[in-house]
């Protein structure tokens, strides 16, 4: 799973017919402390996430299994909205 923050939306007037009712969001991976890291990615929203929210994203075949997207051309799907992240660092 990828921890990420929603930073934008994607509008596609023409797309695969199986994605017509799907919302596409731009996400930026973050570390457990919320610091941005890695490249942006586009993911199908299955949980009605909003701008600025921290989310959980699955990719690959797991993304296609999320919320009935099995036969869709999807590589990343948002499957959870994160309320909090707690990290216990060694030595603290």
Predicted features along the sequence, with ranges:
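Residue-level recognition of beta-strand microenvironments
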Residues: 9, 13, 46, 81-84
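A generic local secondary-structure boundary/capping motif
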Residues: 14-17, 44-46, 66-69
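N-terminal first-folded block
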Residues: 1-37
């Amino acid at each position: 799973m990828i921890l990420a923050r929603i930073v934008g939306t994607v509008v596609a007037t023409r797309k695969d017919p199986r994605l017509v009712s799907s919302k596409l969001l731009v996400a930026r991976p973050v570390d457990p402390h919320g610091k941005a890291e890695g490249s942006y990615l586009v993911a199908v929203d299955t949980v009605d996430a909003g701008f600025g929210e921290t989310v959980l994203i699955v990719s690959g075949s797991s993304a296609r299994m999320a919320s009935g997207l099995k036969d869709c051309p999807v590589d990343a799907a948002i499957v959870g909205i994160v309320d909090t992240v707690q990290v216990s660092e060694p030595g603290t």
